[in-house]
Curated annotation (Swiss-Prot):
Entry note about domains: The RxLR-dEER motif acts to carry the protein into the host cell cytoplasm through binding to cell surface phosphatidylinositol-3-phosphate.
Summary of the function given for this chain in its UniProt record: Effector that enhances P.infestans colonization of Nicotiana benthamiana leaves.
Protein name per the record: RxLR effector protein PexRD50
Organism for this UniProt entry: Phytophthora infestans (strain T30-4) (Potato late blight agent)
Intracellular or extracellular location(s): Secreted; Host cytoplasm; Host nucleus
Cellular component, GO annotation: extracellular region; host cell cytoplasm; host cell nucleus
N-terminal signal peptide: 1-20
Family: Belongs to the RxLR effector family.
Amino acid sequence: MRLSFILAVTCTGLLACATASDSEKAAKISNDQVLSGRQLIDTVAKDNKKRLLRAYKDAEDDSEDSKNVKPTADSKHADESEDSEDSQEERFSLIQTSNQPRYYWWFQHHMTPLDVRRDLELTADTINPIKRSVYTGYVDYYEDHCSYYENRKEEFCKAEDF
């Protein structure tokens, strides 16, 4: 089952990359177009939304000041840190996607993020990035689903200590 899931995710990713490369050749996407598409994609975790809807860095900027500015060592370092942050963010995308059924199960069993932290045996000293990623993904899932009208009045959605 996991193998078929991984194959399905891989095929979907390859198709998405092919479509993205074709659309880049056909028309250049502006920041406004990318931002307006946010209503069309409904993903569960906020991290996935950010990851899927990034604006291109080479988007045209109308200000002349930005065209005349030469890159300095500080700006170069800032670009590198953004790239490393993006790659670190994308590293756990598969982990968060594969844990969606787990998030659903925890939420259906009325578990708060504090309960999930105990379930994962996650303490302040725990360094395990996978467990931390799963926990932060559930916190986002929990906040999103507790904001729905039908879940607002649930007791476990009123928990603030996590």
